[in-house]
Design a protein with these regions (language model features):
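Structured beta-strand/turn binding interfaces of compact recognition modules in eukaryotic regulators
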Residues: 27, 36, 68
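Phosphate-recognition beta-domain surfaces
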Residues: 54
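Short, solvent-exposed secondary-structure boundary/capping segments
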Residues: 42-51
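Intrinsically disordered, low-complexity, charged/polar segments
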Residues: 58-121
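Mixed-charge, Lys/Arg-rich low-complexity intrinsically disordered regions
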Residues: 1-23, 29-32, 39-42, 111-121
Length: 121
């Protein structure tokens, strides 16, 4: 089940450690990015899952992350492979403004629910 931006605006969901808009770092590969959506478990198919270099447990939250300075890439990452980025620095990504209104105190601020436009993950 995909948890979209609007689903988490009302409060926390149990088991999900990283809020939408939080800048995170991949603990194995070191890249930074911003969380834009969350699945409560891995929803990718078996072919995709088996093709990864690692296969973290599927029964945990998985995050859709816009990758910093990647030319517009996004990734799908298991919670166990992420940590909060404490640098306080924003990320550079061409779709960041589609999801977020501002960056303040190390966290991207979600756009209002009534904002026009739709962002694809």
């Amino acid at each position: 089940m995909l948890i979209r931006l609007t689903d988490l605006q009302g409060g926390a969901t149990p088991g999900i450690h990283y809020d939408l808009g939080l800048v995170v770092v991949h603990t194995l590969y070191g890249y930074r990015g911003a969380v834009v959506a969350v699945d409560i478990r891995c929803m990718a198919g078996d072919t995709w899952y088996q093709s990864n270099k690692t296969q973290p447990p599927r029964e945990q939250p998985w995050y859709h992350v816009l990758v910093h300075e990647s030319g517009g890439l996004s990734t799908y990452v298991a919670q166990s492979n992420l940590a909060e980025d404490t640098s306080g620095d924003p990320i550079e990504h061409p779709r960041i403004a589609c999801y977020f209104a501002d960056f303040k105190d190390g966290l991207y601020q979600l756009k209002e629910r009534n904002s026009s436009g739709s962002c694809s993950i």
